[in-house]
């Protein structure tokens, strides 16, 4: 579960390395974000020559969390780190590649494009 001030890694090739959550979208009672939720982030660490730079504010969809997700069959999928994919104003991925695995739960949230860019879908 991701809340304000949480530090996440970026799972795409947009040029950002680490971001900080500054707002969880989804209404006033939406205090934490889970897998597939959209949050507003600030870039804290970026590589030179990337598409984004430090201090920029973007939206991002969460693709991996430490708390994981429980599926209907009872299985649980957890990851070592929290990660997200940066989105532009039209809610499309900024990067052209997604590193690491993503879960099938993104399909229900209408992020099929991220699933097609990912290396592995669990």
From Swiss-Prot:
Gene Ontology CC terms, in alphabetical order: cytosolic large ribosomal subunit
Keyword entries, A-Z: Ribonucleoprotein, Ribosomal protein, RNA-binding, rRNA-binding
GO molecular function, one term: structural constituent of ribosome
UniProt superkingdom: Bacteria
PROSITE patterns linked to this entry: RIBOSOMAL_L14 (PS00049)
An individual GO BP term: translation
InterPro entries: Ribosomal_uL14, Ribosomal_uL14_bac-type, Ribosomal_uL14_CS, Ribosomal_uL14_sf
Signal peptide feature range: none
Function (record text): Binds to 23S rRNA. Forms part of two intersubunit bridges in the 70S ribosome.
Quaternary structure and partners: Part of the 50S ribosomal subunit. Forms a cluster with proteins L3 and L19. In the 70S ribosome, L14 and L19 interact and together make contacts with the 16S rRNA in bridges B5 and B8.
Family: Belongs to the universal ribosomal protein uL14 family.
Protein name: Large ribosomal subunit protein uL14
């Amino acid at each position: 579960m991701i809340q304000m001030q949480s530090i996440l890694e970026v799972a795409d090739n947009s040029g950002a390395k680490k971001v900080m959550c500054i707002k969880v979208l989804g209404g006033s009672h939406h205090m934490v974000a889970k897998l597939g939720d959209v949050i507003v982030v600030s870039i804290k660490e970026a590589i030179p020559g990337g598409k984004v730079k430090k201090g920029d504010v973007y939206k991002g969809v969460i693709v991996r969390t430490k708390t994981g997700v429980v599926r209907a069959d009872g299985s649980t999928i957890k990851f070592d780190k929290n990660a997200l994919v940066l989105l532009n104003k039209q809610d499309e991925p900024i990067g052209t590649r997604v590193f690491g695995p993503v879960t099938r739960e993104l399909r229900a949230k209408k992020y099929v494009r991220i699933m097609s860019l990912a290396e592995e879908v669990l």
